[in-house]
């Protein structure tokens, strides 16, 4: 999967840009706030039909403008005349966005997810450690959805049923004795069906993903530290349908569903201790990088976006990361940095297959 060309109009601070890319390494250098991250976000948008940072589409349109457009020309690497395809999105204030493959609009955006596998590494990844379990579930969901479209369908159905059950709990919160048992059971039976699929897919993913993650961490840290990542779910210990019935009285009191796969967690450890508690900034950054680079290995050379990845890392880890991402194990890479030295070190390893852009106030000049 290669992004050959990208055209942008009125996306955030990028008023107009037409760029052609290298198959391997594409570097963007410039001060903070100039548009480097916005460029990566536009590429992300074409994979996931939304921004990585702001899901309110109208707020991603350049201020004072009424519409924005992102268009990418992709090489799917297939031995046919249709290997090159255009993916485009049009955003207009007050109007539903149009997402198109070639000349055909998608009826449902979910149909596009997984077509263009992509992994993004950004400073926002720190929320995987610092924030609640919903961030870690979102990580699992984001990876699995790229190779299993049924997973995303099950997840959407489960969340819709969860919303229904929570609304019903709220409705009878003050009069729990009047709660309609049969209606609850109808909803819960359907929730269990979707929850089991999600649970088994998450279990399978973590089992297959962890070796790649640990390999990447060892490469970054110099094999000096041991890390682990464990999937924790209530379904590992109990029958969910029985749990729904047993906890329904308590759920009616609190007004929300206390059991289910929406409570799943990832236990992130450095040695025998929680990463959040004992990990230094550099160790936490290395752990997150290993998760994302492991994801790239797991998905099989997706487009890889690396935004400001060297911050908070010592010189030795920076050197190991440069060697790692410059290797043949990764596909097309887009990387940003304010420090030209880091990018120069990468370019020295891949000089013939790299392009570099200077980014200034939303404009991109090839170097």
Q: What spans do the regions from the language model cover?
A:
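Active-site residues of response regulator receiver
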Residues: 307
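A conserved P-loop NTPase coupling/switch region
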Residues: 110-118, 122-189, 193, 362, ...
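Post-Walker A helix-loop "phosphate-sensing" segment adjacent to the P-loop in P-loop NTPases
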Residues: 44-57, 294-301
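Nucleotide-state sensing region of NTPase/ATPase domains
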Residues: 48-135, 144-147, 151, 210-214, ...
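Conserved NTPase motor "head" modules and their coupling/switch loops across ABC/AAA+ ATPases, GTPases
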Residues: 1-31, 175-304, 312, 316, ...
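Conserved lysine of the Walker
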Residues: 36
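Structural recognition of the conserved hydrophobic beta-strand(s) that form the central parallel beta-sheet
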Residues: 72, 332-339
């Amino acid at each position: 999967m290669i992004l050959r060309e990208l055209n942008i109009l009125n996306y955030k601070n990028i008023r107009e840009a037409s760029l052609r890319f290298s198959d391997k390494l594409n570097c963007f250098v410039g001060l903070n706030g100039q548009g480097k991250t916005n460029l990566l976000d536009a590429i992300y948008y074409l994979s996931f039909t939304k921004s990585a940072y702001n899901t309110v589409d109208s707020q991603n349109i350049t201020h004072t403008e009424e519409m924005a457009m992102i268009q990418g020309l992709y090489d799917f690497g297939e031995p046919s005349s249709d290997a090159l395809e255009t993916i485009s999105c049009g955003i207009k204030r007050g109007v539903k966005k149009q997402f198109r493959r070639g000349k055909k609009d998608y009826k449902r955006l979910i149909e596009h997810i997984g077509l263009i596998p992509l992994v993004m590494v950004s400073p926002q990844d720190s929320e995987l450690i610092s924030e609640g379990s919903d961030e870690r579930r979102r990580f699992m969901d984001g990876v699995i959805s790229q190779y299993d479209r049924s997973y995303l369908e099950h997840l959407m159905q489960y969340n819709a049923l969860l919303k229904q059950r929570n609304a019903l709990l709220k409705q009878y919160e003050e009069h729990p004795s009047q709660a309609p048992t049969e209606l609850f059971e109808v909803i819960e039976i359907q929730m269990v069906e979707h929850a089991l699929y999600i649970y088994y897919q998450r279990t399978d993913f973590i089992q297959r993903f962890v070796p790649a993650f640990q390999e990447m961490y060892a490469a970054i840290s110099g094999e000096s530290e041991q890390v682990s990542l464990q999937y924790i779910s209530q379904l590992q210990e109990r029958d969910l349908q029985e749990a729904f019935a047993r906890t329904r009285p308590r759920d009616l009191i609190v007004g929300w569903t206390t059991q289910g796969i929406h409570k799943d967690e990832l236990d992130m450890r450095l040695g025998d201790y929680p990463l959040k508690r004992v990990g230094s900034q550099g160790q936490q950054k290395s752990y997150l990088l290993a998760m994302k680079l492991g994801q790239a290995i797991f998905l099989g050379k997706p487009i890889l976006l690396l935004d400001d990845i060297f911050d908070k890392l010592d010189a030795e880890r920076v050197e190991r990361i440069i060697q790692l991402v410059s290797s043949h194990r990764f596909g097309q890479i887009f990387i940003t940095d304010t420090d030209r030295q880091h990018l120069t070190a990468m370019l020295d390893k891949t000089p013939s297959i790299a392009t570099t852009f200077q980014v200034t106030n939303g404009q991109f000049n090839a170097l």
